[in-house]
């Protein structure tokens, strides 16, 4: 009797979904140029999914983009009438019972919520899904695809289980379960994209998943910033962050001066200050796969070199981003007592971030990759702005950073400090390494995202 009741209850729950799925399949046939894009994260901090949506819209698809709306996406996305952003609510864990139980309940509730959100949207010919995070979104998107006739496209940025392993350890039962889940449901997708050739080979060899490498490329708005725009940005940031403010007042009280530039009141001409500090930029999501103690230790060594009389400039170090370890590193930064270095950690508007990269002298990347198979998009953006980079070494970094060509690769804080000393000696030096790297980046004529997407992704969605 109890078994019959359970079967009847399951049918009652499943029948409406099957009927709705059949109706959506019919609807999908009438809307073959529609794509649903899903990221179980902050849309504003998911540039690659924003770029997918913009490229799809540019080539005639309408796009529904589902994700958390914690930060503002780029204006191009918001102003495109082919793209609709649907906000998801980030569910909080229950503060009851063991942590494993709390996590399990959250995953189940998140799955039901995402299923409900997807089933009541216009069905798409494709569901584009960012992974990670893939728990529970891979299974839910596959299930919705089965009901609605949509083809699931997974864009592999990394492995979710490897990120969990940084917190819990690689052999934790939750991590092993997440790996099995990711591997099993990942094989059920229709198309797979990934960010490096190393990941493509790993997916093929160890997961039996065929993927196409779609390298991260800078969007068109990542470019060198004209001096006039640099000055406006510095003045804007100076109103909120003291490192951008002028170190001394100009002789003419109507002259506008920042820490790096000044605008002549009469002609409106902007010039760089002769004794300006060097501007070093790093971007981070403040997670375990980026050890910012390396940068802080290198800055301490740089400070000591300056105090010892080496011909080095003052430094303004800007670290942008949001994430769980931001407060921890902010406390470490405040404990430092630098005389020649100023560090600030702003969260920039989407439109200001490319302008900052295009205004900086050097980028630093501390991303090491939990899997060793993904590449830091921040470096891609920096290269788009012709900004040379010092990057910490890991397995497949050579696919992006060419040592002594477009930047430098380091292993530890000692090596990074030596690189900073070499690059900033006699700053600004027109004949120095920094300018040579910048020249190489200008001459490389790298593909932009739109051009790369047309060559790699568009044929896949047009042919299948």
From Swiss-Prot:
Mannosyltransferase that operates in the biosynthetic pathway of dolichol-linked oligosaccharides, the glycan precursors employed in protein asparagine (N)-glycosylation. The assembly of dolichol-linked oligosaccharides begins on the cytosolic side of the endoplasmic reticulum membrane and finishes in its lumen. The sequential addition of sugars to dolichol pyrophosphate produces dolichol-linked oligosaccharides containing fourteen sugars, including two GlcNAcs, nine mannoses and three glucoses. The keyword Endoplasmic reticulum applies. Changing residue 363 to A: In CDG1K; decreased function in protein glycosylation as shown by rescue assays in an ALG1-deficient yeast strain. Pfam families: Glycos_transf_1. Changing residue 358 to R: In CDG1K; decreased function in protein glycosylation as shown by rescue assays in an ALG1-deficient yeast strain. One of its GO terms (cellular component) is endoplasmic reticulum. It is a single-pass membrane protein. It is found in: Endoplasmic reticulum membrane. Changing residue 342 to P: In CDG1K; decreased function in protein glycosylation as shown by rescue assays in an ALG1-deficient yeast strain. Its EC number is 2.4.1.142. Residues 243-262 are annotated as: Disordered. Residues 1-2 are lumenal. Belongs to the glycosyltransferase group 1 family. Glycosyltransferase 33 subfamily. GO terms for biological process: dolichol-linked oligosaccharide biosynthetic process; protein glycosylation; protein N-linked glycosylation. It is an enzyme of class 2 (transferase). Changing residue 88 to V: In CDG1K; decreased function in protein glycosylation as shown by rescue assays in an ALG1-deficient yeast strain. It is linked to Congenital disorder of glycosylation 1K: A form of congenital disorder of glycosylation, a multisystem disorder caused by a defect in glycoprotein biosynthesis and characterized by under-glycosylated serum glycoproteins. Congenital disorders of glycosylation result in a wide variety of clinical features, such as defects in the nervous system development, psychomotor retardation, dysmorphic features, hypotonia, coagulation disorders, and immunodeficiency. GO terms for molecular function: chitobiosyldiphosphodolichol beta-mannosyltransferase activity; mannosyltransferase activity. The modification Phosphoserine is found at residue 242. Changing residue 367 to Q: In CDG1K; decreased function in protein glycosylation as shown by rescue assays in an ALG1-deficient yeast strain. Its main location: endoplasmic reticulum. Changing residue 276 to W: In CDG1K; decreased function in protein glycosylation as shown by rescue assays in an ALG1-deficient yeast strain. This is Chitobiosyldiphosphodolichol beta-mannosyltransferase.
């Amino acid at each position: 009797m109890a078994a019959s009741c359970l079967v009847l209850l399951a049918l009652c729950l499943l029948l409406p979904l099957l009927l709705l799925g059949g109706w959506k399949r019919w609807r999908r046939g009438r809307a073959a140029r529609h794509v649903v894009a899903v990221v179980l994260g902050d849309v504003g901090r998911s540039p690659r999914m924003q770029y997918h949506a913009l490229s799809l819209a540019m080539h005639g698809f309408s796009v529904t983009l589902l994700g958390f709306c914690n930060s503002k996406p780029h204006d191009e996305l918001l102003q495109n009438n082919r793209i609709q952003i649907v906000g998801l609510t980030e569910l909080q864990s229950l503060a009851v019972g063991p942590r494993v139980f709390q996590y399990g309940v959250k995953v189940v509730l998140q799955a039901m919520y995402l299923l409900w959100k997807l089933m009541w949207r216009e069905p798409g010919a494709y569901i584009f899904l960012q992974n990670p995070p893939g728990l529970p979104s891979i299974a839910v998107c596959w299930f919705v695809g089965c009901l609605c006739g949509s083809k699931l496209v997974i864009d592999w940025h990394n492995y979710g289980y490897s990120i969990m392993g940084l917190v819990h350890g690689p052999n934790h039962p939750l991590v092993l379960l997440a790996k099995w889940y990711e591997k099993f449901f990942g094989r059920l997708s229709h198309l797979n994209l990934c960010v490096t050739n190393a990941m493509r080979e790993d997916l093929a060899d160890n997961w039996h998943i065929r993927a196409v490498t779609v390298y991260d490329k800078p969007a068109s708005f990542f470019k060198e910033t004209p001096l006039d725009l640099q000055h406006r940005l510095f003045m804007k940031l100076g109103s909120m962050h003291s490192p951008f403010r002028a170190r001394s007042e100009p002789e003419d009280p109507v002259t506008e001066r920042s820490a790096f530039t000044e605008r002549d009141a009469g002609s409106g001409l902007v010039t760089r200050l002769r004794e300006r500090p060097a501007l070093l930029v790093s971007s981070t999501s403040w997670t375990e796969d980026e050890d910012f103690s390396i940068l802080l230790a290198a800055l301490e060594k740089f400070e000591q070199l300056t105090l010892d009389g080496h011909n080095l400039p003052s430094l303004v170090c800007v670290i942008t981003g949001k994430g769980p370890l931001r407060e921890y590193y902010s406390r470490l930064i405040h404990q430092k007592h630098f005389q020649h270095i100023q560090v600030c950690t702003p969260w920039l508007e989407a439109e200001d971030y490319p302008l900052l990269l295009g205004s900086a002298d050097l980028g630093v990347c501390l991303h090491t990759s939990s899997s060793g198979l993904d590449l830091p998009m921040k470096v891609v953006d920096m290269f788009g702005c012709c900004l040379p980079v010092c990057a910490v070494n890991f397995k497949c970094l050579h696919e992006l950073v060419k040592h002594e060509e477009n930047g430098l690769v380091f292993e530890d804080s000692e090596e990074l400090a030596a690189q900073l000393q070499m690059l900033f000696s006699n700053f600004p030096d027109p004949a120095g390494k920094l300018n040579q790297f910048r020249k190489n980046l200008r001459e490389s004529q790298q593909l932009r995202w739109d051009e790369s997407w047309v060559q790699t992704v568009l044929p896949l969605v047009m042919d299948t």
